């Protein structure tokens, strides 16, 4: 990050660190730009395990068409601890988000679908339904596990 050391009291991220492949470099850079006593807080999508995603998760990521570099809670814990952070906390939000995503899928497939298709195009809405079906599946399996991440620079 193009900031001087110790520039910030807080670094916050929402749904963006999923696109950074090197979580150790991320943690080190966040640590560098925080002032002593500073906090890191993020909400992002994690994968439940280290290593390659399952076929179902790979198909979901492919459907999204994004460059996800998902890491496990353990990988984040290790990266932030090794960078020097204390009080590293990861809170799994899968149960909450699974419920939300399932309701969104029901809505996409329900009575609103025709109007959505008229407004946004049938092909687009059909693709959204495909994505949400895959998303709900990997959420239900627990492999896709959105988390809140918090850590403190001593």
Predicted regions and their residues:
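Alpha/beta-hydrolase-fold catalytic nucleophile elbow
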Residues: 14, 43-44
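A short hydrophobic/small-residue beta-strand
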Residues: 40-41, 87
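Short, glycine-/aromatic-enriched active-site segment of Class I SAM-dependent methyltransferases
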Residues: 45-67
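A short glycine-rich, Lys/Arg-flanked "PGG" loop and its adjoining helix->strand segment in the class I
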Residues: 24-39
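A short SAM/SAH-binding and catalytic strip from SAM-dependent methyltransferases
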Residues: 9-22
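Conserved Class I S-adenosyl-L-methionine
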Residues: 89-154
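A short acidic, Gly/Pro-enriched loop at the edge of an enzyme's catalytic core
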Residues: 1-11
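Short alpha-helix
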Residues: 68-84, 90
